[in-house]
Structure formats: C-alpha cells, structure tokens
Amino acid sequence: MPLTDQAKIQIVQERVFIKKVCRNCGALNSIRATKCRRCHSTNLRPKKKELPTKRA
C-alpha cells in the first residue's frame, strides 16, 4: 500500500534515510555520530537517499 500523504512520506524518509552507515561493519548509526556504535570506527558514510529499483 503506497503512501500518498506528503506528511507521512516526510516522516518515513527521515526515519529511513537520515542515517550513517559504517564502512567497516555495516552498522546503522545516527546522523550525528562521529564513531560507529558497534566497532568504534570513524569511517562512516551517509546512507544512500534512493530506493533501489526493482528489476523485471
């Protein structure tokens, strides 16, 4: 069931996409994190903002 309400879409995007991902262990961290919560590495990247496209 796709979302049509713009307010709900905004909430979902904030919860899903505004994260940082550790390049060493793959753990999700908060956007304000400077070190990984799992392996304590400082090698973090922002999570990709696009959903993967489905292949036919």
From Swiss-Prot:
GO MF assignments: structural constituent of ribosome
Family matches, as InterPro entries: Ribosomal_eL40_arc, Ribosomal_eL40_dom, Ribosomal_eL40_sf, Ribosomal_zn-bd
Keyword Thylakoid among UniProt keywords: no
Keyword annotations from UniProtKB, A to Z: Ribonucleoprotein, Ribosomal protein
Cysteine pairings via disulfide bonds: none
GO biological process: translation
A single GO cellular-component term on record: ribosome
HAMAP family: Ribosomal_eL40 (MF_00788)
Family as reported in the entry's similarity comment: Belongs to the eukaryotic ribosomal protein eL40 family.
Name of the protein in question: Large ribosomal subunit protein eL40
Naturally occurring in which organism (per UniProt): Metallosphaera sedula (strain ATCC 51363 / DSM 5348 / JCM 9185 / NBRC 15509 / TH2)
